[in-house]
Amino acid sequence: MINIRKTHPLMKIINHSFIDLPAPSNISAWWNFGSLLGVCLTIQILTGLFLAMHYTSDTLTAFSSVAHICRDVNYGWLIRNLHANGASMFFMCLFLHVGRGIYYGSYLYKETWNIGVILLLTVMATAFVGYVLPWGQMSFWGATVITNLLSAIPYIGTTLVEWIWGGFSVDKATLTRFFAFHFILPFIIMAMVIVHLLFLHETGSNNPTGIDPNSDKIPFHPYYTIKDILGLMFMLLTLLLLALFSPDMLGDPDNFTPANPLNTPPHIKPEWYFLFAYAILRSIPNKLGGVLALLASILVLLIIPLLHTSNQRSLIFRPISQMLFWMLTANLFILTWIGGQPVEQPYIIIGQLASIMYFLLIIILIPAASILENYLLNPK
């Protein structure tokens, strides 16, 4: 009896990707986040699909259609809460996944890393346009402020902003096109995830030691399928606790007020997962400079493989670089906190110092520490 799993054209691909895939024998729970992100994406697409069945992308009815979903649709409140908090779980997993990649030197698989960074940007774009859809105060003003940043581009800025708006302000045309983008982007993300996996399976997974793992591989199933299910249980528990007990904890109270172009909220701020980048944007008093810093805060990930100066791949045996890595992590927490604070002292100066430290650590300090560690290990 020939095993259909190994012969059928479609099954064969799934088999080589998730069942008989040779995986390093020592990968830790930090390697769970890839599969968790896959689950997050699936949850978001499914809940989003059901929300889209009842949502109307019109400025007059968008806000009330979301209220209608929560009040009148069977389990609409649950679908909406899962979708809103699912986004938070998605970003938590994303940040941990990227952090794992930096810590263990996974960025040396350049193709996988680069498409991963593009994926991160695409997910951020999707979350941004999605946040506009409920048409609350923060939706409207967030859309106005962030799209307006493009007007900092010389010559074409203003024209570009009005082209994106579909008029002279954020209005019906903007909401309709943002809904269209929010619907299509997750499917584009899905295709990119497949490419991400394709590149990863060209090289095989990295492992905590950073040493070539080819001498000791085990099949993905049952070992890592079971291990991933454990991580999945933890994530689903967290998501359900959030969605069922405090669904609005991570949201903004201003978004429960329908959008009003005549009334600006006292503090315009994005969702928590954008606050670090928002803090970097606000820390520069010049509009164009702020926009460039905002872009650089994410795009700097693309040059990390070029900044790898160590003779070792992973940080596991490099205490100086480890300390700087955790400083970078703490710095991102500080930036996240600052992004949610009003623009006044001492928050302004803290934000500026944290922004400088962010780029300094990635571009100069960690590569310099790696060179020092090379010398300390081999002083010849």
UniProtKB/Swiss-Prot annotation:
List the InterPro entries.
Cyt_b/b6_C, Cyt_b/b6_C_sf, Cyt_b/b6_N, Cytb/b6-like_sf, Cytochrome_b, Cytochrome_b_C_euk/bac, Cytochrome_b_N_euk/bac, Di-haem_cyt_TM
Q: How is the cofactor bound?
A: Binds 2 heme b groups non-covalently.
Listed transmembrane segments: 33-53, 77-98, 113-133, 178-198, 226-246, 288-308, 320-340, 347-367
Q: Which residues bind heme b b562 per the record?
A: H83, H182
What cofactor does its activity depend on? heme b
Annotated Gene Ontology cellular components are: mitochondrial inner membrane; respiratory chain complex III
Q: Which UniProt keywords apply?
A: Electron transport, Heme, Iron, Membrane, Metal-binding, Mitochondrion, Mitochondrion inner membrane, Respiratory chain, Transmembrane, Transmembrane helix, Transport, Ubiquinone
Binding positions (heme b b566): H97, H196
Q: Which SUPFAM superfamilies does the record match to this protein?
A: a domain/subunit of cytochrome bc1 complex (Ubiquinol-cytochrome c reductase), Transmembrane di-heme cytochromes
Q: Where does a ubiquinone bind?
A: H201
Reproduce the miscellaneous comment text.
Answer: Heme 1 (or BL or b562) is low-potential and absorbs at about 562 nm, and heme 2 (or BH or b566) is high-potential and absorbs at about 566 nm.
Q: Which family does it belong to?
A: Belongs to the cytochrome b family.
What does this gene product do?
Component of the ubiquinol-cytochrome c reductase complex (complex III or cytochrome b-c1 complex) that is part of the mitochondrial respiratory chain. The b-c1 complex mediates electron transfer from ubiquinol to cytochrome c. Contributes to the generation of a proton gradient across the mitochondrial membrane that is then used for ATP synthesis.
Assembly behavior: The cytochrome bc1 complex contains 11 subunits: 3 respiratory subunits (MT-CYB, CYC1 and UQCRFS1), 2 core proteins (UQCRC1 and UQCRC2) and 6 low-molecular weight proteins (UQCRH/QCR6, UQCRB/QCR7, UQCRQ/QCR8, UQCR10/QCR9, UQCR11/QCR10 and a cleavage product of UQCRFS1). This cytochrome bc1 complex then forms a dimer.
**How is this protein named in the record?**
Cytochrome b
Species assigned in the record: Tarsipes rostratus (Honey possum)
Q: Which gene encodes it?
A: MT-CYB
